[in-house]
Swiss-Prot record:
Amino acids binding ATP: 6-13, 120
Gene encoding the protein: mnmA2
Species classification: Bacteria, Pseudomonadati, Bacteroidota, Bacteroidia, Bacteroidales
Taxonomic superkingdom: Bacteria
Coiled coil: none
Stated family: Belongs to the MnmA/TRMU family.
Keywords, in A-Z order: ATP-binding, Cytoplasm, Disulfide bond, Nucleotide-binding, RNA-binding, Transferase, tRNA processing, tRNA-binding
Disulfide pairings: 97-192
GO cellular component: cytoplasm
Segments of this protein annotated with the region Interaction with tRNA: 142-144
Protein known as: tRNA-specific 2-thiouridylase MnmA 2
Main location: cytoplasm
Enzyme Commission number, as recorded: 2.8.1.13
Reaction equation(s) it catalyzes: S-sulfanyl-L-cysteinyl-[protein] + uridine(34) in tRNA + AH2 + ATP = 2-thiouridine(34) in tRNA + L-cysteinyl-[protein] + A + AMP + diphosphate + H(+)
Role: Catalyzes the 2-thiolation of uridine at the wobble position (U34) of tRNA, leading to the formation of s(2)U34.
Length: 353
């Protein structure tokens, strides 16, 4: 079996290679190069990633190829993020990177020549009813199925997640025992294409700054200024520069560039328990095809370890969720990710409208 393994230079993908080799496979290794336009945004972490990936390849006597998808990334993902931010929405570039780049452009250019593509994602695949489904990871804190919830059946059927059945500390222990060069490397944080680049610097480069008012939601009183609504997201608490906190962003007026904040964030009053999703993507199949009733599900609206219980309803306008608990910071542009009631199978996701 021919396996392509995606390396990032981190401990997770390094352990993937180790486990595959232990099982007798000789995967071909690939490092996908993405990044920002402009020399001032060059990030030295990419060079370190390639060095560590090269060390892993040499360690196991495997071929490593660097695949440059910088232009494809910019055209498909970075531009998507900027457009969402411009509209006052909250993008999820990691979701789109997986869908369009790692398992999209890479598959079209390289992965098509292999039987499977192995990655260091914390996820699993399940065989149910003769079909492949995306399953959650053993480690609920590291589970990354919400970042994979826009892929399609062709993509999920070719994916292999060797560490999906392990806890993070077990992955570290394997790396330490094997003496892998990335064993003690810290996990990456933040948006996949930014590396060590500050998020606000990235937004500022493309959208600039424009001063606007910060207004207390309950009183209508101006309590400060901001440098552009695009720097702020619904539910944001940090980085507002206001005294007497905590303050939370509860509303944005895109037309007039106004940020509304609340001192005592009342999620129930602001949002209730319900949200709609548009353009819902079922990864494998719609398990409720033809059903007109309510379905008991669990879901996520952001990358957190917790799965929230709720009811999924379908009508002429699409799908909506009624949550079992009040929700904080529902952000248009993000994805509502739907799972079965036991949080074992990830069925897919839709953009929160």
């Amino acid at each position: 079996m021919d396996i392509a393994a995606l390396l990032s230079g981190g401990v997770d993908s390094s352990v993937v290679v180790h486990l595959l080799c232990e099982q007798g496979y000789k995967p071909t290794l690939f490092y996908i190069k993405i990044g920002m336009d402009g020399a001032e945004y060059m990030d030295c972490s990419a060079e370190e990633d390639i060095e560590l990936s090269t060390a892993i390849a040499r360690r196991y006597g495997l071929a490593l190829e660097v695949v440059d998808l910088h232009r494809e990334y910019w055209d498909n993902v970075a531009a998507y993020a900027i457009e969402k931010i411009r509209k006052g929405q909250t993008p999820n570039p990691d979701v789109m990177c997986n869908k369009l780049i790692k398992f999209g452009c890479f598959e079209q250019q390289v992965g098509k020549d292999f039987d499977l593509t192995a990655t260091g994602h914390y996820a699993t695949t399940l065989q149910l009813g003769g079909k492949t489904w995306l399953g959650t990871a053993k480690d609920p804190i590291k589970d990354q199925t919400d970042f994979l919830a826009q892929i399609d059946y062709l993509q999920v059927s070719k994916l292999l997640f060797p560490i999906g059945g392990l806890m993070k500390h077990e992955v570290r222990e394997i790396a330490l025992r094997a003496g892998l060069p990335s064993a003690r490397r810290k996990d990456s944080q933040g948006i996949c294409f930014l590396g060590k680049i500050n998020y606000n610097d990235f937004v500022r480069r493309f959208l600039g700054e424009k001063e606007g008012a910060v207004i207390e939601f309950e009183t209508g009183k101006k309590i400060g200024t901001h440098r552009g609504y695009w720097f702020h997201t619904i539910g944001q608490r940090k980085g507002l520069g206001l005294g007497g906190g905590p303050w939370f962003v509860v509303k944005k007026d895109i037309q007039d560039n106004i940020i509304y904040v609340s001192h005592g964030y009342d999620a129930e009053q602001q949002y209730g328990y319900e949200f709609r999703m548009k353009d819902f993507n079922f990864i494998t199949d719609n398990p409720w095809e033809g059903s007109t009733g309510e379905e008991e599900v669990t879901f996520k609206i952001r990358h957190t370890p917790e799965f929230i219980k709720g009811r999924l309803l379908h009508d002429e306008e699409g799908y909506r969720i009624i949550s079992s608990e009040k929700l904080q910071g529902i952000a248009p542009g993000q994805f509502g990710v739907i799972y079965d009631a036991e949080s074992r199978v990830c069925f897919g996701s839709g953009e929160i409208g």
